Each structure stands twice: as structure tokens, then as C-alpha cells.
């Protein structure tokens, strides 16, 4: 039986009275943006099997940062009334008024504009795909009003980091959209999606009863006590696909070691989740992707 302290953890909460900068950083969950970066770079490195040009790496970071800022702000804005009713999320800055609705809308508009500008400077294919990528990101908070597959929608956003990193570099070498799509390291894209379903469920399981009362959908609500094993199954599939990616894309021993560590850290996160410590489980699960991303990058770079 899971023992969950539902009021103890919220990655987007800001209970302390600190500077406006601190409040913005908590609001945007800025650390998660940096944790996503290695997976975007993994996509870029695996796609061309060499170190990408530094300007492109900088543009990948900027694009990821601006789009994630827009997406996270939109998520908070769309859910502000729901968050106000949830004991776990009622300290979020948009709920408490530390950040205003007007500020949030301004952040979204500026961030989306800067994302499209960054994508334009990456390459033609990145730019023409940018509206579709933005649509996937910005529509997420509304999906959970309708379907449990919102967990996979969120996970697909994480997979888009790998996809977008690959497009950013492949567009430098190919003039055909088909060639760019063929060069995407799809095994790692799909592995990332299954990995992300697990950590998203760690976020939703503590809120399952509340979400059910609000008419919100997730696999945590749909599956009840079976949601945690379902999260573990998704992550097992993720590890298998990551190993297949190592093999299919002819990566070396460092990548394989990183994949083993990736799986072991996820296993520990699953253990923590079984103990009801979803806060630590959530972050250890993110750490596992950082290990995988950095390991694959080092493997190719050396």
C-alpha cells in the first residue's frame, strides 16, 4: 500500500518569500529545462555521429528554453483555477498572485516569438516544423480534460526534444524533408516518450483522487493502484528501446554503460515511488535521462 504525503511536494510551488527572480524560476521549474537539454543534444549528436557546430548547439538551447518557458507558463495559466483547489499546488505563483495573469500572458507571447525566431536561425526545416512543435506543447494542458492519453501527450513533448535536436543538425546537410525525417534517431525519440510517461505518472499518482473529483483524466485516474506498475512497464520498454538505439546507431561502450546506469537510476526511482516518495522519484527519473544523454554525447564526442 502506498503512503503518499499529498501536500509535501510540488516542483512548481514557491512557498518562501524570496526575490522575484526566485519566484520566476520556481514558476518555470527552470531546472527541468536544463535536465531536458542533454536529450535534445543526444538527438543532434546521434543524427550526425559527430559534434554539431557550436552555433547550432546554442540555438538548440535557446529554442528549447523559449518553447519550454511558453509551454510551462501556458500550463500554469490553463490550470490556475484547478491548482488553487489542490492542496499540493496551491502555492504556485500564479495561484498566490506572486505572478499575475497579465505577466503570464506576456511571458507566453514573448517566449513563443523568440522560439520562432530561434527556429528560423536554425534551418529551414526547423522553422517550418516549429508551429507544429509549438502546437503540441501548448495544447497539452487541455488534453487532460478529455483523455488519459494526456500522459503520452506530455511524454511526446519530451520526445520532441530528441526529434528537434536531430532536425536542427540534419537540416544543415540535407535538402530533402524525407532525408531529414529518415535521419531522425527514432528509437531514442520513442524511448524518451516511454521514459517520460513514467515520470509524468509520478506527478499524477499523488493527485489521482483530486483529479478524479475534478473530472480530469490520466492513467493514474484510469488505472488506480495499477498505475505505478504501468509506469514501471513504460520505463522498462524505454530502457529496452535505448539499448536497441545503442546497437542500431552503432554507439560505443560509453553509451551502453550510460544506458545501464539510466536503467538502474530509473529502477531506484521506481523503488522510491513504491515507498510513496514521489518527489524524489520524479527527480531521480529526470537524473536518469541526464546520465543517458550525457553518456551518449560523450561516446560520440570522443
Regions found by a protein language model. Name each.
Residues 2-302:
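Multi-pass alpha-helical membrane architecture of UbiA-family
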Amino acid at each position: 500500500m502506498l503512503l503518499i504525503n499529498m501536500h509535501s511536494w510540488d516542483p512548481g510551488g514557491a512557498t518562501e518569500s524570496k526575490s522575484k527572480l526566485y519566484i520566476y524560476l520556481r514558476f518555470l521549474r527552470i531546472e527541468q529545462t536544463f535536465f531536458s537539454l542533454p536529450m535534445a543534444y543526444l538527438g543532434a549528436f546521434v543524427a550526425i555521429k559527430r559534434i554539431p557546430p557550436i552555433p547550432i548547439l546554442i540555438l538548440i538551447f535557446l529554442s528549447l528554453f523559449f518553447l519550454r518557458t511558453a509551454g510551462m507558463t501556458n500550463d500554469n495559466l490553463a490550470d490556475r483555477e484547478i491548482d488553487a483547489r489542490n492542496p499540493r499546488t496551491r502555492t504556485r505563483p500564479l495561484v498566490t498572485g506572486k505572478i499575475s495573469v497579465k505577466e503570464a500572458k506576456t511571458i507566453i507571447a514573448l517566449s513563443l516569438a523568440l522560439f520562432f525566431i530561434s527556429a528560423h536561425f536554425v534551418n529551414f526545416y526547423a522553422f517550418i516544423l516549429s508551429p507544429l512543435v509549438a502546437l503540441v506543447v501548448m495544447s497539452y494542458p487541455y488534453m487532460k480534460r478529455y483523455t488519459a492519453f494526456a500522459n503520452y501527450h506530455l511524454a511526446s513533448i519530451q520526445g520532441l526534444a530528441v526529434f528537434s535536436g536531430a532536425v536542427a543538425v540534419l537540416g544543415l546537410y540535407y535538402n530533402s524533408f524525407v532525408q531529414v525525417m529518415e535521419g531522425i534517431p527514432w528509437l531514442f525519440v520513442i524511448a524518451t516518450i516511454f521514459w517520460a510517461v513514467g515520470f509524468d505518472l509520478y506527478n499524477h499518482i499523488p493527485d489521482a483522487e483530486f483529479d478524479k473529483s475534478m473530472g480530469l483524466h490520466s492513467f493514474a485516474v484510469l488505472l488506480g493502484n495499477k498505475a505505478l506498475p504501468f509506469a514501471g512497464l513504460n520505463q522498462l520498454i524505454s530502457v529496452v528501446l535505448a539499448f536497441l538505439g545503442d546497437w542500431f546507431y552503432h554507439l560505443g561502450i560509453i553509451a551502453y554503460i550510460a544506458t545501464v546506469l539510466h536503467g538502474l537510476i530509473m529502477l531506484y526511482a521506481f523503488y522510491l515511488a513504491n515507498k510513496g516518495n514521489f518527489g524524489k522519484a520524479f527527480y531521480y527519473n529526470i537524473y536518469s535521462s541526464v546520465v543517458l544523454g550525457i553518456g551518449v554525447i560523450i561516446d560520440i564526442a570522443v
